[in-house]
A protein has these predicted regions:
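PLP-dependent aminotransferase class I/II
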Residues: 12-16, 21-29, 38, 42, ...
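Active-site phosphate-binding strand-loop segment of PLP-dependent enzymes
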Residues: 2-90, 96-102
Length: 238
């Protein structure tokens, strides 16, 4: 489906690591290489990549890995969410990562992200406090989404406990897998030879059942004190 959707207008492929399970990135790389003749770069980064960029939505997969490589260093660019409901949280916010691109200065990409997140200012508050460094410029009409010091402190504290949280989630998921083994449901495979999940969500498809039956299951689970949800409604159903 991805290959069929690519046209000369395609500027990026945005896969989603749903529930914490990494996508098949080898397959995506094969597709972008196969379709590279359709891609017309419009800036220096795109020219250096020489293929349609893979920009991964890793909101669910902080701590996951694909063939031994942590998510965040698999796709060309990746974005993570640190929202309050995520495995790894700073209460709000997130981060972006990228793989090194030959011919492109990583520091230049970093500075561009800084401009985008700090409403175009070319110096942050700390830099402006240094002797004689008060002057700054506005390089563009960008966004206000820089992380606060408090959020960063929460994130650093989370780093210390996160390996234990991942191990705990894996233990719970493996217990669920055993419990659901003989039931008529389809499950995501969180842990395989190719990938290790972050265990963000445990998704269950009720095979051959309609929405009415699903809703009854949700109600019964709620009565048992177990919260469940539907992730996610297709856009046309909203």
């Amino acid at each position: 489906a991805v290959a069929r959707a690519i046209t000369p207008k395609t500027k990026a492929i945005i896969p989603v690591d749903i529930a914490g399970v990494p996508c098949d990135y080898d397959r995506l790389r094969f597709i972008v290489e196969e379709k590279k003749s359709l891609f017309t770069p419009s800036n220096d980064i795109q020219k250096a990549l020489a293929h349609i960029p893979i920009v991964a939505d890793c909101a669910h997969s902080f701590g996951a890995s694909y063939k031994g490589t942590p998510t965040g260093n698999v796709a060309d660019f990746s974005s993570f969410s640190f929202h309050a409901v995520k495995n790894f949280t700073t209460a709000e916010g997130g981060c972006a990562t990228w793989r090194h691109i030959d011919g492109i200065d990583d520091e230049a990409i970093y500075k561009q992200f800084q401009l985008l997140s700090l409403h175009g200012q070319d110096k942050d508050a700390l830099a402006k406090t240094k002797a004689g460094a008060w002057e700054y410029d506005i390089k563009g009409t960008y966004y206000k989404c820089n992380m606060t010091d408090i959020m960063a402190a929460i994130g650093l504290a989370q780093f210390e406990r996160y390996p234990k949280l991942l191990a705990c989630r894996k233990e719970i998921i493996e217990a669920y897998d055993v419990a659901f083994k003989d039931l008529p449901v389809t499950l995501l495979h969180h842990y395989t030879d190719e990938h290790q999940s972050s265990g963000h969500l445990y998704l269950v498809r009720l095979d051959g059942r309609d929405a009415e039956y699903r809703n009854k299951v949700i109600e019964a689970m709620a009565e048992a004190g177990i919260a469940t949800n539907v992730h996610y409604k297709p856009i046309p159903m909203h």
